[in-house]
Amino acid sequence: MRSALRLAFAAVAAVALAPAWAASIMHGFADMSSMTLWVQTDRAVRVVVDLHPDGDPARRRRFEAATRAEDDFAATLRLAGLEPGTRYRYTVAVDGKPAPDPGRFATQPLWQYRTDPPEFAVAFGSCMYMNDRFDRPGAPWGGDFQIFDAIAARAPDLMLWLGDNVYFREPEWTSLEGMSARYRAVRAAPELRRLARATSHVAIWDDHDFGPNDSDGSFVMKGAALEAFKRYWPNPSHGLPGVPGVFGMVTWGDIDFFLLDNRFHRFPNRYPQAPEKAMFGRAQLGWLKQALVSSRAPFKVVVAGGQFWNRANRYEAFHNFPAEQKALADWLLEQKIPGVLFLSGDRHL
């Protein structure tokens, strides 16, 4: 009898200790013919995505990737060759085990020269602080994470993350491994999982997901910060050849979003005022000007982690770089480019 009981307890323990399906999933940007799916596992495994148009399982397609320790077990799958304006249903299998719930997304419609531009909804936010057991003493800053489910319930077409999307702590910003550990903990948070699969996500950064508070281009670990950002945010592009950073552009419907990097090339805030003192840098602003002139969008939304024009801001803002700010303002007035809007993060409500 004792042997039977031991066997029974062993069987129960084996069931209890069997690893559950464990992976973090986030939707990247979706265009008319593809969507980026980001997946992170807890070990090196094979990831398989089965995909088909919603309601048409006969047109099933398969995409595969492998997660590796050197990439923090994160993989980006480009689900390409899709049809415009189509809803898709997918299942992710990790090491042969399918996710408990299927995912869904839609490609952008092909509307040009055919119909009016489609209506769409954009959500945006910044400063996502999640409390940790080794945070400094005092009242915790993080909370009210029910906002993520509220956003997910609205099912926006696009979510713009405006920086400080994670907060590196002192033990973390000194290494790629530390930065990745913070990203991994936040991305796996239960509070974020529904939103991560509810819409397309595109991000920029600000100081706290770049390095220390108020960090700038002198931060010696900025290369590691950029590598971690690319690993966890599968934007369509990151910077330009020869000009590193997280800046780029995405288009949704008939609106262009210009994503700026206010950290990688930034001069220190306390640098003496001089013509060369810059927040964005000549190369990045040169690209922005060309892109604005080239854009045919009725609205052109310029996005950055810090405020552009609010002079009442006593903290970090573009007005601390008056030469660069004035040069951009003068250029915009001279060019008379219509429909330019500015969107920034870094403000806490």
Region spans (language model):
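Metal-dependent phosphoester/phosphodiester hydrolase catalytic core
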Residues: W21-L349
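Bacterial N-terminal signal peptides
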Residues: A8-A18
